Amino acid sequence: VYWSGTGNTESMASAVVEGARKAGAEATLIAASEFGASMMDEYDAIAFGCPSMGTEQLEESEFEPMFTGCETKLRGKRIALFGSYGWGDGEWMRNWENTCREDGAILACDSVICQEAPDDDAVNACQELGAALV
């Protein structure tokens, strides 16, 4: 489940799905605008992807409202987080990870962040993230 403004996080999301499929999972790429809390129980594990926006925060118009709605369903759910950023040091991801832990989510692996467009290392890390959810 992802939101992407420039296509960078969408590229990462595609790599996550590819990694999950290579590991034997049935995986679906879903835009944040098409996902909601009522769908959480349909999935054994979920990767959430959102770039850093503004002052190192989640995208506020689509992704954050969707994710906030899902928070009550995170307890005991295996998840992974990923996203791109233009500047900063990844504070948005650390804050997001803390929120997920406080909500009782099980982080399946280290989160993946990359600056701007994902390079080969970031694509590989996203594929590994997808596989870790299987």
Summary of predicted features, one role per range:
Residues 1-3, 82:
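Short hydrophobic segments within beta-strands
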Residues 8-11, 15-134:
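FMN-binding flavodoxin-like domain, especially the glycine-rich phosphate-binding loop
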